[in-house]
Amino acid sequence: MEQDYKPHEIENKWQKKWNESRIFQAEPDKREKFFITIPYPYLNGNLHAGHTRTFTIGDVVARHKRMLGYNVLYPMGFHVTGTPIVGLAELIASRDPQTMDVYERLHGIPGDILPALDTPEKIVDYFKVEAEKAMRMIGYSIDWRRKFTTTDPTYKKFIEWQYTRLEEKDLIVKGSHPVKWCPNDNNPVEDHDILHGEEATIVEYTLIKFRYRDLVLPCATLRPETTYGVTNLWVNPNVDYVKARVEKDGNVEFWVVSRDAFRKLTFTDRTVEYVEDMPAKSIIGIKLTNPVTGDEVISLPASFVKPENGSGIVMSVPAHAPFDYLALRDLYDADLSEYGITEDLRKIELISLIQVPEFGEFPAKEIVESMGISDQKDPKAEEATKIVYRREFHGGVLKELTGKYKGYPVSKIKDILTRDFLASNAGETFYEFSEPVVCRCGTPCVVNMVKGQWFLNYSNPDWKAKVYKCLGQMRVIPTEYRVEFENKIDWLKDKACARRKGLGTRLPFDKEWLIESLGDSTIYMSYYIIARFIEKGELALEHLTLSFFDYVLLGKGDSAAVSAETGLKPELIEEIRSHFNYWYPVDLRSSGKDLVPNHLLFFLFHHVALFEEEKWPKALAVNGFVSLEGQKMSKSKGPILTLESAVSSYGADITRMYILSTAEQTQDADWQKAGIDSARRQVDRFYAFAKDVIESGKRGTLSAELKQIDRWMLSRMQNYIKETNAALDSIQTREAIQNSFFLLINDVRWYQRRGGEALLYYVLDNWVRLMAPFTPHLCEEVWEAMGHEDPVSLAQYPLYNEDLIDNGAELSEEAVKSTLNDIEEIIRVTKMTPQKVYLYTAPAWKAEAIRCACGLQVEAPLEVGTLIKTLMAKPELKRFGKEIPKFVQKIVPEFKSGGAERYETFAYLGLDEKDLLKESASFLEKEIGCPVEIQSADSPEYDPQKKSRFAEPLRPAIYIEEKKEE
């Protein structure tokens, strides 16, 4: 081995060896298979730290399973369909300054190459090479023969087959539906297309149509029941309003809305025409009719009304909305004569319509007064609003004022009222984003009611029932995400599956439309199996007919008929079918948590729609995001840490180890330079340890006579093997690294500090295999230096051996370690120089108390009174009557807080502390630098400060004699 750890040299060496030996190329055999897939990356930029985390988790799982004896398939492809790459090409072609800066400075594209990437095809060709290079640099155990891009003609044939079969099952429908829409691209947008607002949802509002003469002033609300409590409308005097002719289903009305709302209305299923501007003053101070109650309400000025929200006009319910109550109260003494308003607004009576157990008649007024909220700008107003809303929604019922709806729970009334209001023309539906959405092209998006659009019928209850069944049979990691998946399935509605612009596959039954980018990335895991034969040149585009896919993926038809149609040999068709049957279903789909509400859901929906139950996915795993020094990363804006730059700076293994050890699976990780520098130092220590052990030439065996410290090391190693395997099975990579590296390295240091030597080679042999999934290049180098010819990547992963567990040895070393720590702490605090240290082991009666406590807790939960009574009943212990209660009150809480196991080991093994400490005395003396004497607290020979009375089992009392100055 080299003197110093040189990561790049080692990594280049082993990547070349892996590539030449093809050890990660998987073919069916007699072993149990494990098929793991990670979402292929979208190629509108270089891979970043978020990809690094998700892909490395997948690689660690793949390597672990491979070392456990599974036949592992870990493939990868590249996602390029949709509009983002088209948009990026346009920005590069126009030399957009921000884009050119971000992609040269942050993505690392050379300045002489970037300007040439001015077409989608050139971008795809560039980034697919860069992505594969980066993934090879970090050492992923991928079968690269199966790679593809989603614009490959052969892949398009696969997608055409999928959508043909979905349409035949009536799972694709045509109709009108609200979708996220970019007016500039004239296309639906999905999460991959969005610059801001990726988490936004489409929310259905009810527009209540308040009338003034021949005009309608619509107000959007999420709570149509509150229409019964409206006292006034709010109009912003500083906003531009327009009058518009609105026609729907032959009904013509003239609406007054903000300019922003007018723009949004043009994308709905209404015919909307501009008529004229309407100054805000012209609609303030007017008396309107509530379309539900017939009551007269006044419009009042309010600068807080946002023109971009809803219609730009808001209805006010001051009895139940704290902000409305505060706004109305703030106008009581205001001069509103410029709006023609002269009446006393105090005369506006609050209207109570909901009975809430926690409140009286006017919840908003009550909470404003009880919380001491001064005005609308008081931060407590937001909190008050949430409290009232939550209590009304979960516990409120409608009052008699609401007529036939009296007694309905607030939580159940929305859909009923919306239906009835629409039927009576008192209201209409209106769709709005939950937050602003901006397309990657920079255009603010709208909710568009698209006509003649193709939709995946995800709301189909029969389809959802199959997805629920699939989810119920699957393993979800971590388990708490199961509820989220269930909620998302329940929530999922029909989704647009086609667009007019971008890269992708044409709908086979309507060639004017392109299948959108999330819709073509649902069952591509099955294509990896076919891609293997395309790569070999055994399958060509003309062979990929509908009947070919039907047979090899679904088993429908027969190979003879497919052979006759395609010209393929029946033997090849049967071979492809057998490969599919071997590898499918997917054993684990692992992904970042951002894909839970879309990609991972669609993955389930499409699998249950097309495949038989035995081919449904078996497990899903979810991991968190990665930030960079506390900042969220962004491909298009920065900051960003590319996978390639991380590996170039720190090495593959250190990057892998750090990205997986900073946070547990679903937690978000934060990449920090200080943290990865620390990881480098730890890996250096491991390398130095391995080098020393190998160069020593000593190869101790388990058959040799073992000392206590050896038995301790054996036992600790088995615990780490057990915990690491369990953690990896649950994809808790941080926990796995903690056990297989950080905690283990501390124990190895203690072992060596205690003079342990016989098992160092055994430790290294297990350790290097434990770490191989995380730091494969380093471990291959060490494994080879140990004399092994076959790669560690294919070696047997360490398995737990309970026979090597020695609880007594572990407890003994724990006692030695804690005793040393206590002595060192006393010396540190007192700043004394020790002349001699006296250790007093616990008296026999305290050991008996521990044994008695262990026995009692087997029968029932241990209680202080019960233990005292039991001990006092023993004649030989009566003389300790004053001390027993104090000791019992101390140890019982320890038993209950996790200390029972160590006490049980102490009691059942009959550990002799005095002998233990005597055996360790020479070690303690060397560490402390002075003599150590062991005495029993039962009969101490020298105890000038009566310290022995503090001695307890596993916690000797300590007296330090200070060195006198000469």
Swiss-Prot record:
Motif 'KMSKS' region: positions: 632-636
Residue numbers binding ATP: 635
Keywords of this entry: Aminoacyl-tRNA synthetase, ATP-binding, Cytoplasm, Ligase, Nucleotide-binding, Protein biosynthesis
Pfam families: Anticodon_1, tRNA-synt_1
UniProt xrefs under Gene3D superfamilies: Class I aminoacyl-tRNA synthetases (RS), HUPs, Isoleucyl-tRNA Synthetase, Domain 1, leucyl-tRNA synthetase, Valyl/Leucyl/Isoleucyl-tRNA synthetase, editing domain
Compartmental location: Cytoplasm
An example Gene Ontology molecular-function term: leucine-tRNA ligase activity
PROSITE patterns for this protein: AA_TRNA_LIGASE_I (PS00178)
Catalyzed reactions per annotation: tRNA(Leu) + L-leucine + ATP = L-leucyl-tRNA(Leu) + AMP + diphosphate
GO cellular component: cytoplasm
Motif placement: 'HIGH' region: 41-51
Gene Ontology biological process terms, A to Z: leucyl-tRNA aminoacylation
Enzyme Commission number(s) of this protein: 6.1.1.4
SUPFAM superfamilies in the record: Anticodon-binding domain of a subclass of class I aminoacyl-tRNA synthetases (SSF47323), Nucleotidylyl transferase (SSF52374), ValRS/IleRS/LeuRS editing domain (SSF50677)
Family: Belongs to the class-I aminoacyl-tRNA synthetase family.
Listed name of the protein: Leucine--tRNA ligase
